Curated annotation (Swiss-Prot):
The gene is argA. The keyword Transferase applies. It comes from Aliivibrio fischeri (strain MJ11) (Vibrio fischeri). This is Amino-acid acetyltransferase. Belongs to the acetyltransferase family. ArgA subfamily. InterPro entries: AceGlu_kinase-like_sf (IPR036393), Acyl_CoA_acyltransferase (IPR016181), Asp/Glu/Uridylate_kinase (IPR001048), GNAT_dom (IPR000182), NAGS_kin (IPR033719), NH2A_AcTrfase (IPR010167). Its EC number is 2.3.1.1. Its main location: cytoplasm. Residues 299-431 form the N-acetyltransferase domain. One of its GO terms (molecular function) is L-glutamate N-acetyltransferase activity.
Amino acid sequence: MKFRSTALVKGFRQSAPYVNAHRDKTVVIMLGGEAIADPNFANIVNDIALLNSLGLRIVIVYGTRPQMRSLLKQTEHHAPFHKGIRITDEQTLELVKQIAGQLQLDITARLSMSLNNTPMAGAQINVISGNFVIAQPLGVDDGIDYCHSGRVRRIDTQGINRMLDQQSIVLLGPVASSVTGECFNLLSEDVATQLAIRLNADKLIGFCSEQGVLNEKGQILAELFPSEAEEILQRLEKELTPENGKLTGTMRFLKGAISACKAGVPRSHLISYKEDGALIQELFSFDGIGTQVVMASSEQVRDAEIDDIGGILDLIRPLEEEGILVRRSREQLEQEIAQFTIIEKDGLVIACAALYPFPEEGMAEMGCVAVHPDYRDGDRGVILLNRLRAKAKQYKLSQLFVLTTRSLHWFREQGFIEVDVSHLPMKKQKLYNFQRKSKILVLKGL
């Protein structure tokens, strides 16, 4: 008897919108040396190969930090740090080149695998490395000569894009040459950040030891604006002690993610290299699994406050007059303001929606959904829906329902199904207006 998996079918179908959204998008992936040394690395390579087969344009930047520490210990060579950057003298540079070359070959070999009965079967991936990054020395700081430690001077974006257009994966390490023919040791996080910025990448992805950025309670923060990420980074830096005075891999990548987003990279993702399938879950599921640092926008999605009532009234009044929304008084809005989420642009409320929980039935109502006429050509309705879904999940609710007279098809497109009045919570059934005859739709499995 053949094995059948409805979960596989369901997951595959749910991933389809993300497959379409990510196709032909440029992604820079940062693989620190810790990720390469982890037992899960083979699975990470398999997932990167899968992204390549789905049409993503992939640049990989790898690091060498733990491998370098091990080699320095073996050779009993001391390579001190200054302001968090290793001073790379001639002997240290030779060791860095040795490790970087070895890891480049190892990663290339992994990506070249195409054995039957493996996830890489039939992949036939071309991996391209080269002098796409030109370096320059860091120079002298506070009387300390960084020697062969360097920074990115320029990047051959045209050359990289030609390789990506051919569906090749571009693989780059922390060692780059200069216009004088010298080699320099660069911070791999800086290389990845600069590549994402100068390639106008759609995403910068970093594999870290933690599953994203955690708040003070140890909970994963799903999304951060650069300003929020900066506050967290400053807090983490203050917690560093003399015994543990170096930035962690997560902190270094978070710093790069902030810079990338400020420079125009729409999204940077922090995920764990320890968890099997983290990359796929982050990119191809609604909730993701790690932390996203997203570009700040003139539009802000936030919880409504009492001062927003005037703006909400201005937004919903025309819809109430048309009979699309049930009329609400200012007094009612004042009582319910905590239930509202709004999208604000330059001080104007351009969209709103409210969430009314019914915890006994494990349900919540999405009500008073309105978008300003000038802003209905975007995805603001979807943004509000996603925010309310997340809130409902926080309340441990499993279903979201809506009553509508005009937007039946839009809600069905978002996964809602039409039901009869008996599916409503008992309190809502008693208030249902049979003359208005609103359509009832339910979204299950939040």
